[in-house]
Amino acid sequence: SAPGQDFMRF
């Protein structure tokens, strides 16, 4: 995942 975008792992 990209830095700052770990919340997009769904």
Curated annotation (Swiss-Prot):
Tissue spec. comment: Expressed in the CNS and thoracic perisympathetic organs (tPSO) but not in the ring gland, midgut or abdominal perisympathetic organs (aPSO) (at protein level).
Compartments in which it is found: Secreted
GO cellular component annotations of the record: extracellular region
Main location: secreted
GO BP terms in the entry: neuropeptide signaling pathway
Modified residues (Phenylalanine amide): 10
Keywords from the UniProt entry: Amidation, Neuropeptide, Secreted
Family of this protein: Belongs to the FARP (FMRFamide related peptide) family.
Protein function: FMRFamides and FMRFamide-like peptides are neuropeptides.
Protein name: FMRFamide-like neuropeptide SAPGQDFMRF-amide
